Amino acid sequence: MVEEDTQKTEEETSEDKPQVIFLSNEGSDDDPKIRKAMLYGDIDESSAKDIIATMILLADTAESQELSDPSDPGSEIVSVVRPFEIVVSTGGGNADDMMSVYDMMRMIREDVDIVTTGIGKVMSAGTLLLAAGTKGKRRIGKNCRVMIHAVTGGSIGPMHELTNEFKEIKKIQESYIQCLANETDMTVAQIKKYLKQKTNVYLTAEEAVELGFANEIF
């Protein structure tokens, strides 16, 4: 869940240590043009730093020179921008760190396609990152669970500080809602209706595609 305290804004976390695994810069044997990385576990400063660094590397190495006709060694050499893939499986994490990854994805996808793949669970902060892939290149496993919910938080301190923190929580939620609306087929009003249920809202892979979090199920 998205939580706010005087130090951090967090989403629901698990006990597992966050992992960002850099899989390849050269691509798989099946598709050498696709480079991959994995975001697995909680989204926090450490995992956000690692996935951002990986995305920057993959973006900086996206352009390559290839034969226009691979079967003809004498064909013209052309410049090709190779996409990369981020595999996401997370229960959520820190909202600020989510936004740092999201903003980097927005910047990079202007020049390089980002394929996003959701597996296992894509919840809370993870839903925005799944949806932030290049339109038409976002996919989700048929058994993947998706969950969205409202920002939550807690603080201890003088009343004036608590009032200030509450205002900030509201700002974070409004920003989160607007970003989801920008990346999915949902309107701001639809998202707010879901969040007003004041509970975790779970979606099947089919529902996630219908609402625009992903484009296809595998």
Indicate where each model-derived feature is located.
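Terminal-region recognition feature
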Residues: 1-218
